[in-house]
Each structure stands twice: as C-alpha cells, then as structure tokens.
C-alpha cells in the first residue's frame, strides 16, 4: 500500500485498455460467484482466488500450502498465491469485451464530451452507439474522384437498363391487352366488360412505370449519397447503407455501435481540429463561435493533458476487488450480495453469449442486437439509470451502480472518507454536574474502564498486579477492585473530548478532564451547555479519547473547555451563567428597602436618639451581623473595604496614584454585592449594581460585559476560576432565594374587560366601514384591524407589567434575564393577542384570554394554526440551515492563514465615530458607530490614522485594540482604512494581518488557523435562529424575503424576487406615468446621454429616498422617489432588493462586496445575532475569486472560461514579460455552490455535489489535486494542512533540557551521569523561533 505521507498531489485521468489490463491480476471469464455447496469461490468467476488472492491468510485454495512459511509461492495445483487475504481488498480483475463499448459518463454526461469531440449531436451519437443508425468513418476521396466518370457511366447504364426493362414490360402488357380485347370482341362481350379489362391493363402498366421510376430515383439517391459521402455522416436508412456497401465498399468504411465511434476517435487529429476551432473563434460570431468555444474546451483538454481520447471507448472493463463488493451468507442459507455482482454478472453473461455468436457466425442483425445489450449492461454497471429505465433487482429496486457508490450522503466520499466512525469512543445521556470545575466532566466508571482499557492493562502489568497482558485483560473484564485504583491513575490528566450532535461550530466538540462518577450518565459542566447548545432533557453526547501524546497535548492546550470561553463568531463569551445561576446572582445583588424581606438593618444616618445604623468596619463584621440575623442580604449598608479594588470613579477621586491592596475606602453597597465582588479577582474594579444577563439599564450590570472584560484583561485560567465561583454562588443563592413558580404567582388584570370593550367598539366601527359603507378595501380593513388589536395587546401587556411587585418570582426570572421575556408574561396573565394562520397571515380576531384564564374552543383552534406552523418552520429551518453550513464550509474550506503579512497597502474603509449634536445642530462630542463591534474591532490598520491636528494616532499595521478604538472615537476620527481579507494578496488562503485578531482568543490569528471553516461555522451556526418568514408589506412591493432564505439568496448570488433596478449614472430623475408602469429617465450630471428605465412596476413601488425637510434643512425625512429628485450611482429606483450582478456591473467589485456584507448583516442583526464582518468577507472573497476571460491575449486561457484571478494575474505578468498581450478579464460573482464546484481541487468538488460530472471533467483534463485544502487531505487520510498539521510544525523534533537528560540517563547507584556531555548538542531549554531554526 502507498503511504499517504509520501505524495503531494493526486491526479485523475482516463484509463486506456492497456492500463486496465496492467492493473488486472487476471481475466474474469465466468459469471459464477461461489459454489453454494462448498462455499468456495468458483474458478475464473467473480470471486476467483487465483485472480484476487486467497480467502484465508497464508493458505492456497486447494490447501496444499498452509502457514506463512510458504509466503509468495504460487500453488501449481490451484494457481493461488500464498499471501494475506487482505489482498482481496486491492487486487483487480478485468473482463475482455467481445466488442468495444462507450463509457456512459463521456457520452451521456451534460455536456456530452464525446459529442463535443466528434462534433456530433447527442441524439445522433445515441443512435449510432445503440445500433439505430450507421456512420461513415472514412472516405477514400482520391479513388472516388479518379473513378467517378467510370462509376457514373455504370450508374447511367444501369438506369438505361431499368428504362429498357420497363419499356419491354409495358410493350408485352400492351400486346397482351390487344389479345384480350380481341378475344372479348369475338365472344361478343359488352362494352363495359371490355373497358374493365382495359382499365386493369392500364393500371398494371402504370405500376410498372412507377416501379421503374422508383428504382431510377433510388439509383440516383444512392449515387448522390455516394458522391457527397463524408466522414461522420450518418445514414439512418438501412437499405441505402447496404446498397452503398454492395456497390462502393472499396471507397469508404462505415459501421454502427461503439466500434464505429472508436474508429472515428482513432482517425481524429486533435491538433488540426484545435487549429480550425481557434480560427472560427477568432473570425466567427454568434452561435457558431459559441459552439466552437465549447468544443475547443474539450479538444484542448485532450491536447493539454495528453489523455488518449480512445479511453472513452472501452475494449475491456476493470472488475473491482471482491472484498469491496462482498457476498455474505445469511441465517437461512441464502446469500446477500452487493448489487455490483449482479451488474457484473449481466455483463459477463452477455459478453460470453456475444463471443459464442461471433464464433458461430450468426447473422449480423442478431450479433448487433447482442452488442447493443452488452453496451446497455456496461452502462448499467457504470451508471445505472442514466439512460433509459434502470436495471432493477428484487422488489423493483434500482441496482446501485459504481457511480451510485460514490454519490450522495451514503456514497463513498461522504459516508466513508469524510465521516468515518472511530474506535475509543462511546456515547451516553448527559446530566448536570454542578460540582465540576469548568475543565472537568463526569465520566461513568464503566464507560471509562472500557475506553481506557489498554492504558489500564498496561499499568496493571507495570504495577505487578498482573503477570502479562492476557491476565490483565481478564482482570479488567472481571472488574477486580484493584482495577479501579489503576483506572483513577490512568485517567488523571488524560483529557477526553465530548461532542454533541449537531456539531454546528467548533465549540460543539471540547476537551475535559474526566472525573469518575457512579451511574451511566455523563456529567456536563453547566457553563459548557451554551456552546454545545445542550440541555438535560434527554440529550446524548459522544466521548472520544485522544491517544497519542500529541493528540492529548492538542486537546489540553487548544480544546480544553476553560480555554474556549469566547465565541469564534463574535468574540463574546459563550460560557456564561444562565437560568438558575443568573437568578441566584440577581437575587444576591438586589437591593431592598428596610421594610422588605432581606432589607432589614439598612443604613440609617445618626440622629439625636442614637448613632447611625448599618455601618460596618469590615466585610467580616457585616457577615457576623447577618449571622446574628440583624442584617439582610440585600440591605443597603456602608462598609469599610481594604481587600477589594474600589470602583473606577472612587479610585480616580481618592487614589490618584492608583490603589494598592490594603488601602481603605468606604463602600455604599449591600452585603450580597460584596459577596459577588469577592468572586471576582481582587484587583478588578468593584461592581455596584444588580447582575442581569440581558436587559441592562440604570443600576444594572450585564454579566456578559463583566466576563468580556475579564477575558480581555486576565489570563484564561483566572477567568475560568472566576466563572466557576460565579456558578457555585449562582446555584447556592438560587436555592436560598426560594424562587419558584406556581399558579398563584400569575396575577390576572382586574380591569381587562374595560380595556378590551373600548377596542371592541373600535373594531366594530372598522367592520361597519367595510361591510356596510364600503369605505375600506379588504387590505385596508385587514391592516387596520391588525394594527388595532396589536395596540390592545400592548396596552393590556403594559398594564399587566405594572401589576407585578418586584419580589414576585415571575418578573424576577424575566428581569434577571434568566429565562423568558415580558411577552410571555403578557400571554400568561394578559392576553395572547394576534395569531397567524398557516399561510403566515394574521387572523383578524385576537385571542383575548390569557393562559391563566384559559382559552375558548374557537381561540384554541385559532391558536393551534400558528403553533403548528412554528413547529413545521423550525424543522425546515434546521435542515436548510445545515445545508447552508455545508455549502459555506465547502466554499471556504481551503482558506487558511498561510503567512504573516502579504504586504498589501490596500484595505477597506470602516466607520468609527459618529457626531453627537444638540438641539441646534452643533457637534457636542463623539460616540462609537453602532456597528463598531462587528466591523472595526479586531482589525489591523492599513494606513496611518491621524486626528484633526494631523498627529499620527495609529501606525500602519498596528492592531486596533479596544483602547485604541476608544481613543479614535474621543478624537472624532470618523472612519479608518483597515486591512481586510477582501484585499489580501496571498494567492491561496489569507495572511494574518489582513484577517486581524482571532475572535476566540483576542490575539492576532496564528498561521495555520483554518479561518475559512471558522467563518462558515460562524455564519451557519445561528442559521437555525433565523426565521423562514416572507414578510408581507401592506400591498406594495409584494413579499420581502427575509431570514434564512434571504441569506441563501445572497450567498448563492441569485437574482432576487422583485429585484430593484439601480441607477448606473448620477443625475436627475424624470418620471413618466404609463398605466401600470413608470418609465424613468435619468439626466446625467456630466451631460452624457440620458439613461432610460422602462416598464418599472407600479405595484412594486418606487424606492424611498432621504431628503432634507423644507422647514428645517438640518433634519432629514424619508419619502418616495419623485420627479426632479437627484440619484447617485448605485441608488435603487424601486422598492425591493438589488441584484448583486447589477451592483457588480455598476459599482464594481468593492461595491458588491459592501452590498453583500451589509445585506447579510441586516438579516442577522434583525435576529440579534452578532457576527463579525470578517467571516462574511471570507465567503464573499471566495465568491469573487474568479473572472471570465474576454480576450485571451498571449495567454493559454480560452475566451469565455472562468479562471482564478490570482492565476490570471500571474499568467498576464508572464505574457507581458515575454512581450505578449495580457488576457482581458471581467469580474464575476459566483454563488457558493457554483464556486465550490469550480474549486481547483477535484477531490473536494467531487465530495460536495454532482460527483460524476466533476470526476468526468477532472479525468478529461487529467486534473491534479495539489492537496491544499482540508477536505482533500481528510479524504486521502493525511493530516490536514492547518493548525498543528501545517508543514512548518511537522518536522520539529523535541530536544530535552540538561535536567531532563540527566533524569533520563542517570543510574541510581552513582551520583553523576555516566554519559559525557560531548555526545549532545547545547540544550539550554530556550525556545527557538521556528523560522530561524529550520528552513521552512
């Protein structure tokens, strides 16, 4: 077997018959498989041991040679080589065909490669191949020309003979008629009898003339056909072809079936054909030029690759190894076999029958029919169902052909090469493990024992519990007590990986240190749930064991849960307290008044009656007061604190030099808040406020912001420890808080009826206007009722909110952000409001009752529509989202950080600061742009950034940290030019500077990071949260696609529904009203020709524009585009989305990049999902990587082909250097599916979609896969060239330090090492920069 690490590229080409014979170990001659009595393979059959190798290791078929000592001997009795039975997985056979057959991929694929090569229409080709027509393969023009006069004379002579025969026949018949008439007259027959005889004779003579004319016409047709006969001419009429063969067979050759095609291919001159086609392309136009271009692609492919086109017609076919198409015996003595065996059997049967017929000299028609059947059986073997009805097996099931084995989710690529199952893995249900640390998981004892079995057995032998491995194995299987102690040792510091399907992003698989637990369920840390999207309602997780030291190191350093706190999509923390923990922390940090429970002992200033209350000298004293029951947890008190850092404002005021541990300050706080701050690192500024997960507001602190801040300023280990403390405190105080939900906590609004009566009256008025007065259209009635009842729901909801006291558990849960939202409380206690029907339109009767009161039957029925639609949508969305992720991964999988800096000066401009104006419109300061988090953060400056005075604030190439961005905002810098993957000049992949920082680590991205995969996961993972809805815009503009379908539409670069045309020039608008349409004319500002847009739909509506108010020119208003308005280049003229192809044409590459980023982000932001722009930019870079060649210049490119822009750049540079003409290209935007299939790697494209088409194309072009991306390396089993598998890390050998060497080579009885140091290099233990240490 070839070792995958010893080759760098993989090439695919066309196999000739000689190649197939060379691979083969023998010819399969019989259709038999195995003997059903002896169960041994039949000789020369499909499982023959002589051809494919022995079925048992080191044993020949007849049993003469057994054991390994006869290795390599070929038995003289049975002819079987003594070797391992594994060779039956790799040895091939072949079938010698009695007649050639065409390969269905090349004849039936779209486009038909055979058809393009030979310039034959696929229909004609099919007629020839399946023996329905003859084709002329060659004509001897010289001989024909030389003998033409003689042949013509012969033909004219034959014509004269025919005419002479006709004349004599007619004369004979006329003479006979005379006799007959004479006889009749003599007999005294009547006139009508004579006429009858006369007519019959005339009719006969007419027939004779017609027959002769037909004969002459046929002779003329045969002669004309012969004179004009040319190669590749098809003759459908069998009789004409036979006549031609009879008369002129010396002057031409022809035939039918694959044999004729083979002859044509052998006579085909690639070079002269390519020359002719290039001539047509240069001088021709229209359809002719297009056809020539398409044909040249195929001809040039054969020319360039050196493939022999004759490989498309097969003289022999390969038989794949028998272990890959096995036959197994079932219980009842029957056999289950792979479909391939049936298909091979059909081929062999028909082939043998054809051989026999040819030997017997059967009539041609029978032989041709048998040849056609052989062709069909080979077609079915290669690709069943591609042509005609598929061959079916038992139960009318189409048999799986060789093509079907590769295709689809169950095919070889996706099932066995990209998705292997692995050993050392298990799965079980998960339960919560609140006692665990963030980097730990609970592993059931039995599962751990099975997973770590080899490690345990090794240790048992090492520790002398067992004499050998066999007895150690027995001990493990019997679960002896000592095994458990050894297991504890084996699992310590050996991380395991947990995975929850679906693994939508890289945090769906993380490493943990196992802790042994009783029971059979895996225990998961509560904070890890968010990343896995796990809950404990029966979810299962898989456990995988990293075996090698390198794998363990990677799991511990890169994948440990405590090192993966931040989301790779947005850089926000994913491991955050949720649910109970949030409730607990909210309860702990609340503040209450003296008269509320938990508020006793609050601060009261000193009065004449007594000293101040609620003042404590230390945190310890406050704790003591609580233990005595005089101080509530949430009471506001004053405490002297010296062990925690003061809040920022107090520190600035009281400790201008900076605060040191031990410096005393006075906190105005609650005991609970001190307890919370105790959880944070001691030098983190004190937080005074109530902790919430979402919602924010005055006096509230977002937990996410705190963790973000911690992650940015402290090492990961500190962050992980802090979060564990938060988790413990959250659970502890959630338990103590007694927050529960019961029916009595749901308070019902007393005055709901009054509110609803008011709205009911309004609704009646609207209904009356529609039904009785006809003053409203159906649409207006609908819109008004929807609006009315939405207002009603809001009013009832807001009233309900005011009804609840702060200490009611329901608002506590909602306000803390632990679960639910206010809308759900409205539904529980107020009213459900409007619901949708199954089409997604609102039902105009609202649900007026709350769930607490209970719904009426009609309300329940109305509500069930929407609920079911919701569930159906969710299911569809999950599937669609998964497919989108798969396409995104495929298009971006080879985008890896390849180098540190590509050295480009280019970049994109992103907004930073926005002016803050007062009522008069004066600028009072600056604030950060709303999109700063997802556009500027984590980038590298492309050029120097200067403030208003011209001082350089940021140097080119400097990272834009949060601190720098704050400084830029303060200085009022409105936009900066940053490096972006869109402008990166690295040919394959991207450079670290253009990518910026990795969102998951907060540091500049490492070389080798698979940023393309991260980008695809970051976009695909939130896909399930996006809606499936199509929004209805009240009558105008039709439906607006939103949510997931919109994202797909953008990434596939489809023309959107109701697309809006865009202005190609800047100028003034002139509108003409033409019934249902507008005609819009733009008068350009530069005075060039006017641009006219016709047939603009009124129904779609004109676009909205922002214009200054007449009364207050400082303010802007939105209104519909009108006569005399000014439009800029790229402005939309109608409502609806713009077509990306139009945007590319009008605004160029940068314009379409910006358009796509903005549009995709709009969809995600609408759902509250934060994704950094750089992820979307990576996908867009892949969509815009190629261009169409318009003029090829002096390059090798063909006009009309898609080429990689970096490839074209290199080719143009070479052409210019040699004094030639560069190629002209037009930028193209390709959808992600098309871009994936156009990738350089044929392995990656074939495993994605349209497997057979990709492989057909790759084989003709003899494509070579350079194994640059991840997918192709996974398929062939190499380490992926990303992360730690990148080449610069591959050749590193680790050298021990002095201390380590002494420890390794010391002998206990002697003090010193007996090895001298001169045998070693200098090991100082210092790390060596990789690039200097090795020439990489």
UniProtKB/Swiss-Prot annotation:
Binds 1 Mg(2+) ion per subunit. Binds 2 Zn(2+) ions per subunit. DNA-dependent RNA polymerase catalyzes the transcription of DNA into RNA using the four ribonucleoside triphosphates as substrates. Belongs to the RNA polymerase beta' chain family. Zn(2+) 2 binds at residues 902, 984, 991, 994. One of its GO terms (molecular function) is magnesium ion binding. Its cofactor is Mg(2+); Zn(2+). HAMAP family: RNApol_bact_RpoC (MF_01322). Signal peptide: none annotated. GO terms for cellular component: DNA-directed RNA polymerase complex. Transmembrane segments: none annotated. NCBIfam families: PRK14906.1, rpoC_TIGR. Mg(2+) binds at residues 535, 537, 539. GO terms for biological process: DNA-templated transcription. The RNAP catalytic core consists of 2 alpha, 1 beta, 1 beta' and 1 omega subunit. When a sigma factor is associated with the core the holoenzyme is formed, which can initiate transcription. It catalyses: RNA(n) + a ribonucleoside 5'-triphosphate = RNA(n+1) + diphosphate. It comes from the Bacteria. InterPro entries: DNA-dir_RpoC_beta_prime (IPR045867), DNA-dir_RpoC_beta_prime_bact (IPR012754), RNA_pol_asu (IPR000722), RNA_pol_N (IPR006592), RNA_pol_Rpb1_1 (IPR007080), RNA_pol_Rpb1_3 (IPR007066), RNA_pol_Rpb1_3_sf (IPR042102), RNA_pol_Rpb1_4 (IPR007083). Coiled coil: none annotated. It holds the Pfam family RNA_pol_Rpb1_2. Keywords: DNA-directed RNA polymerase, Magnesium, Metal-binding, Nucleotidyltransferase, Transcription, Transferase, Zinc. This is DNA-directed RNA polymerase subunit beta'.
